[in-house]
Amino acid sequence: MGNILTCRVHPSVSLEFDQQQGSVCPSESEIYEAGAEDRMAGAPMAAAVQPAEVTVEVGEDLHMHHVRDREMPEALEFNPSANPEASTIFQRNSQTDVVEIRRSNCTNHVSTVHFSQQYSLCSTIFLDDSTAIQHYLTMTIISVTLEIPHHITQRDADRSLSIPDEQLHSFAVSTVHITKNRNGGGSLNNYSSSIPSTPSTSQEDPQFSVPPTANTPTPVCKRSMRWSNLFTSEKGSDPDKERKAPENHADTIGSGRAIPIKQGMLLKRSGKWLKTWKKKYVTLCSNGVLTYYSSLGDYMKYIHKKEIDLQTSTIKVPGKWPSLATLACTPISSSKSDGLSKDMDTGLGDSICFSPSISSTTIPKLNPPPSPHANKKKHLKKKSTNNFMIVSATGQTWHFEATTYEERDAWVQAIQSQILASLQSCESSKSKSQLTSQSEAMALQSIQNMRGNAHCVDCETQNPKWASLNLGVLMCIECSGIHRSLGTRLSRVRSLELDDWPVELRKVMSSIGNDLANSIWEGSSQGRTKPTEKSTREEKERWIRSKYEEKLFLAPLPCTELSLGQQLLRATADEDLQTAILLLAHGSREEVNETCGEGDGCTALHLACRKGNVVLAQLLIWYGVDVMARDAHGNTALTYARQASSQECINVLLQYGCPDECV
């Protein structure tokens, strides 16, 4: 049925191959074959095992015939080891061969103990009809035999070696051609390399590792999995420690930042359409901000954070009413089934406000009004076990879920306390800001009391609340929208009540006013009808664009032989604000940056800062003067502002990028 290849291992002789014949060269004449009955189990081994000799021989008792000249079992499949008939033939032939060799050993008085000590491992490989005609069988056998001495050298010295049973090794190789030599021996010619398949045995496969060579195919090896450290955050860090109980390390992390009053892992529902729950590391600080991170590592590195401002938010628990003692001015949701979204979208509705000083013991519990759909909502409340929601004033909702009821209630109580503390601090800071802004309010009131500022500069609407900074005028809200469409080059719009007003801006507004501005911008109106409060927006826009964009009503320049730039220099030196505004309205950027003709190289900005006039300095900057310009001595306007001790001019110049020589 097939031939038998016997592999023997000698512990004292190195592995040798015959390069010319292409087969393993034996160093001794003995051939030792052992079956399952003859193995010497428990035989002691030497402490140091040397590389072994491996001999591969083809038995002569069973000669190899060509597959076409031999009788094959009808039910024989590709793998003979899986066929009962092939296994029976193999067992009969191999057992007969072993019995004959054993009888020969007894006749010649050959001791098996000698072989058990001399040879460390013996195994018989059966070559059936399917494996005998496949490629590169020689190299496959060599690769297997190379594994044996390497395995012996790597074994524990205290481990005893037992000769394994005869095993059926099936090789999944391509094709091999066997030729007959003149001396009766068999030689194998290989044509393609292959990888041996796993032997069909019940014993556990040993882990072999053969050094790769050019002529040896890669064997199938079992190697232990190694964890890669390519993506570890820090050198020497253990990624397993970061995954274990991050709550236990909460008190030892976050140095250099505000220590959270509460922190831990919570589940957060994503806002996408999938609505998946992901773990987040959530921190609550005393500044009224709830921050969540993707992991504890991100919190330690202070990256990938998202914050929720609790001052403008409220917390809701499904199936529970909020505690009135811990919430201040919290809107109460209606009993409609729509829930949070409708309440936040409207932004209106009933709300109950309580003083922060009222304690929970003085206020009775509020029972929710009976709802006709209460029975329908019971199953919905059961689904939301440990989750809570944070809803902002804009309607944005964050869903969180804790592991237990107690943990959820602790988070809810802590967040409610921070909401109340944020509202209280907001009230105290607002009162402080009111005290500090009294001077600003008085200054703004003085601007409104100026001549002509009681009406809109363009349509005469009463009590205007909007201003144009570079024009120095007040206007109504409708005209302010038209001024915004002109662009900041022509009009810089700002609200009297909503925006901040620094000192230099208040001085500009209090120095010009509507009457002075209209005397310049409407100096040549030629009797045209000015729009009124009842005029349409189109009429107001037509008037405003003709007045400021086309400059149709602008007063004419004074008759003089000086250029506009020189006139501007003189008006700045004389601090003539009305003439300077007229010249700026008529002039271009080049004319505004004209220097004095006396050789000192000063611009109008240098002269304004030398005088310490912040109004002229600010107007010149808005109309395009170069703040980086230097005079003949290399001085900037900031140098003259420092000489004049004008802090307002210094602030304006630094704000617009004037180089500071003192830094």
Swiss-Prot record:
ANK repeats lie at residues 600-629, 633-662. GO terms for molecular function: GTPase activator activity; GTPase activity; zinc ion binding. InterPro entries: Ankyrin_rpt (IPR002110), Ankyrin_rpt-contain_sf (IPR036770), Arf-GAP_GTPase_ANK_PH (IPR051282), ARFGAP/RecO (IPR037278), ArfGAP_dom (IPR001164), ArfGAP_dom_sf (IPR038508), PH-like_dom_sf (IPR011993), PH_domain (IPR001849). Residues 235-250 have a biased composition (Basic and acidic residues). A zinc finger (C4-type) spans 456-479. Residues 259-420 form the PH domain. Residues 203-216 have a biased composition (Polar residues). Residues 188-202 have a biased composition (Low complexity). Residues 441-561 form the Arf-GAP domain. SMART domains: ANK (SM00248), ArfGap (SM00105), PH (SM00233). Residues 182-216, 231-255 are annotated as: Disordered. Keywords: ANK repeat, GTPase activation, Metal-binding, Repeat, Zinc, Zinc-finger. Belongs to the centaurin gamma-like family. Putative GTPase-activating protein. PANTHER family: ARF-GAP WITH GTPASE, ANK REPEAT AND PH DOMAIN-CONTAINING PROTEIN 4-RELATED, CENTAURIN-GAMMA-1A. Encoded by one of the numerous copies of centaurin gamma-like genes clustered in the q11 region of chromosome 10. This is Putative Arf-GAP with GTPase, ANK repeat and PH domain-containing protein 7. The gene is AGAP7P.
